Amino acid sequence: MDGSGEQPRGGGPTSSEQIMKTGALLLQGFIQDRAGRMGGETPELGLEQVPQDASTKKLSECLKRIGDELDSNMELQRMIAAVDTDSPREVFFRVAAEMFSDGNFNWGRVVALFYFASKLVLKALCTKVPELIRTIMGWTLDFLRERLLGWIQDQGGWDGLLSYFGTPTWQTVTIFVAGVLTASLTIWKKMG
């Protein structure tokens, strides 16, 4: 958990294919959950419900709890609402690159990337640009493959997320949210 580069802590599958497959399931589930909380059924997403194994369900629950906490942070929501999405690809890749620009990788930033992608998808839903939804998911998975895959493998696969957060206590989640908020403030100030 200290990032010292010791043995992988997650203990999950670490093949590139399995990490990308699990990442896609987690991203899709996270976006469906966020959209569902916005207003019930969202057939416009065009995403089918995919059965998850026990490990993926645990990961999804962890992401949902963190997403709930981020949703309740009004300052973060205000900043996200202010993001201009006229050129969403540029915005997505600028924010994603900025999140990891210092070379420090951690699960909080990976979750922040998923959260940002979900917010862009929800904006696309609200502005009735449904073709953008799969595109944003594709950008997120491309970024994951190109920039984060090796790091996730080094952490022992996606199960490293659970090792990192464990069963998040309110204190852990609050510290995490404060970190994401600080990073997000920096990102959006630079974009402004």
From Swiss-Prot:
There is a cross-link at K128, K190 (Glycyl lysine isopeptide (Lys-Gly) (interchain with G-Cter in ubiquitin)). The chain crosses the membrane at residues 172-192. Keywords: Acetylation, Apoptosis, Cytoplasm, Isopeptide bond, Membrane, Mitochondrion, Mitochondrion outer membrane, Nucleus, Transmembrane, Transmembrane helix, Ubl conjugation. InterPro entries: Bcl-2-like_sf, Bcl-2_BH1-3, Bcl-2_fam, Bcl2-like, Bcl2_BH1_motif_CS, Bcl2_BH2_motif_CS, Bcl2_BH3_motif_CS. SMART domains: BCL. Plays a role in the mitochondrial apoptotic process. Under normal conditions, BAX is largely cytosolic via constant retrotranslocation from mitochondria to the cytosol mediated by BCL2L1/Bcl-xL, which avoids accumulation of toxic BAX levels at the mitochondrial outer membrane (MOM). Under stress conditions, undergoes a conformation change that causes translocation to the mitochondrion membrane, leading to the release of cytochrome c that then triggers apoptosis. Promotes activation of CASP3, and thereby apoptosis. This is Apoptosis regulator BAX. It comes from Bos taurus. The lineage of its organism: Eukaryota, Metazoa, Chordata, Craniata, Vertebrata.
